[in-house]
Amino acid sequence: PEALRVAGLPEALEARGVDVRDLGNLDGPRNPWTAPVEGYRHLDEVVAWNHALMEASYAELQAGRMPIMLGGDHCLGIGSITAVARWCREQGKTLRVLWLDAHSDFNTSDVTPSGNIHGMPVACLCGLGPDALTRLGGTSPAITPAQMHQIGIRSVDPEEKRLIKTHKVDVYDMRYIDENGMKRAVEAALAGIDENTHLHVSFDVDFLDPSIAPGVGLSLIHISE
């Protein structure tokens, strides 16, 4: 987050008419770099960070503002989307999530090859995972697979792919984009949106071509557009 501030992101947003309120950085436990326990790496730390982010995001939504979260591992999408889902239920709005990522992040502890929770956030949001994450906001699942629309996917583990098909997640992968173009993928993912739809965009930098954004943990070559 500090690098984004130094790079002038707040000023760039303000120049486009956005009223920016920088609330500073969230804080949480540091990464202990330990081995997986019962299929999960650093579960306690992930829960703590996501709980902090959920509370901060929900407070901003309650105040009538649009929270924008920058920086961090994409497992933090659990906290931000759980907050938005809760707010949408209370407001009677329909939530739609655009997940822009090179990975589907639909692993579970039963199929993950690594135990890294950054490969599991979408599954956790859909109710597949440890109670501490699937019930982070008190309701499980936080969202249904039908509310999740993924664009730019180009790395999926074999068993993860089976889970995605079983739960019918809407995925526009690189093959679809190569054949139909990014414009059509986005139009399809946004089809049916109306005035009562709340759109949440969750963006992992590895969605971009690594020649543009090389500084990611799991860089994959070439997203065409």
Which role fits each region the language model picked out?
Residues 1-224:
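Conserved alpha-helical scaffold segments that buttress catalytic/binding sites
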